[in-house]
Amino acid sequence: MRQISFFLLLLLGLSACSSQYNIDGNSSLACLDGKKLYLRVPKTKGKAANGVNIDSCVVVHGRFSFGGTIDSIALAEIYVGDQHLMPVVLEGGQLLLQVDNYAQTITGGPLNDRLSEFMTQRARFDNELWELDRTANRLLYNGKTMAQVMSLLEPRRHDLLQKIELLENTFILDNVNNVLGEGYFLMLTEQQPFPVMTKQFLTIIEQAPASFRRHPLIHRYLLAAGYVPAAAEKPQTAKTSDSVSQKK
């Protein structure tokens, strides 16, 4: 009887440490129908920094779903093959996803609400950049030279890129104490062809608390990029994207 009680308590304890999540998604993108989606979380152990697929599903008539348990809140990513589709916070409970041509939205839980608001703002800037590209192509088609198009549109493009960077920096620094800040910073690092400290990364790292830099994956990236904290004797040993381009 005591042995049964022990295993019952152990089972209850394990249940308390994990949470159940259910994701229901809708997509208006015809290109996703019939495609297999993968739910991927970061791999914090081992030398490889690749993500781990914890679930998969097929999009049928614009609908898809994931479900399972997770030990702790995590920022996961949904992939179509090797192509990133969107992030989602696995924070337990029922999560609803909407994917269309203009944005991706997530509802269900405070962190997902915060993430969805950020993604909506980011999508507005991305759409403006896309419109600039269309305008550039139209001007070139109508006989404008590349130099004329650049002179006309580059100031607006630069302004949009600055706004995107500020939005991303603010989002990360406002969420340094939860999975959103850590996870989105790591998503930005994945966009680099190799570990390097860009000006944006330096800005974030220098303003973030030490606990942020101690995150296993962030710490691993900083070491690979040659980052040295500002308080160290030789901070100039950190590699930056500008210095790499100058060497080339």
Task: Give the role of each language-model region.
Residues 17-159, 165:
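A non-transmembrane, solvent-exposed segment enriched in polar/low-complexity residues
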Residues 1-27:
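Bacterial Sec-dependent N-terminal signal peptides
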Residues 157-163, 194-199:
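Helix-turn-helix repeat elements of alpha-solenoid scaffolds
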Residues 166-172:
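A short, acidic, amphipathic alpha-helical segment used as a generic capping/interface helix at domain edges
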Residues 173-248:
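Charged, long alpha-helical assembly modules
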Residues 119-122, 162, 175-177, 184:
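Charged heptad-repeat coiled-coil "stalk" segments of single-pass membrane proteins
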